[in-house]
Amino acid sequence: MTDSNNQSPNKKTSGSSSAPPAADGRQENRRSRGEKRGGRRDRRGQERDSEWQERVVQIRRVSKTVKGGKKMSFRAIVVVGNEKGQVGVGVGKAGDVIGAVRKGVADGKKHLVRVPLTRNSSIPTLSNGRDGAASVLIRPAAPGTGVIAGGSIRTVLELAGIKNVLAKRLGSKTPLNNARAAMVALSELRTHKATAKERGISLEQIYS
């Protein structure tokens, strides 16, 4: 009697112990698949982020008058671009510099502008942009000229991927106004093909 009682629990335990390893194996497979998918998503996100470059144009300490007194914070002006015809200018405010820069980068990516580039990494036509009291004039240049501009205007043009251009600043010298004026000028650029289509003429008539 003692032998039969001792053997029956062993059989039950052996049968019950065989089920959990199979379930554990399935869970491990699911986890490994999820990790692979998550790894692919992370890689894609890193590749997208690696295409973009950020440059801080200005960091200022600003204050806001509230009921309890003055609240101090930092304001960062950031230019974001991929040097392939996309560029944006963003402004971020936070209690620390790092937070302000991060908000500026996020704001810049929300306000991207596509710039039509020529084979010589220049712009197709002359353009003028204005923001507040600042005015910026940009015109195409021959290969080897470089970026003839200064301040925040130069930063915007370089991150847009323009390598040969002439720019002139008129009016206000404020970095934010100049950067936004340059963005307005770039947003108004059109390719020769698009201009011909809008005017209803051929490309030969534009070049002539």
Swiss-Prot record:
Recorded superkingdom: Bacteria
Is Cytoplasm a UniProt keyword of this protein?
no
A single Gene Ontology biological process assigned to it is: translation
> Which keywords are on file for this protein?
Ribonucleoprotein, Ribosomal protein, RNA-binding, rRNA-binding
> Which residues are connected by disulfide bridges in this protein?
none
- Keyword Acyltransferase on this protein? no
The record's similarity note reads: Belongs to the universal ribosomal protein uS5 family.
Q: What is the protein name given in its UniProt record?
A: Small ribosomal subunit protein uS5
The species is Prochlorococcus marinus (strain NATL2A)
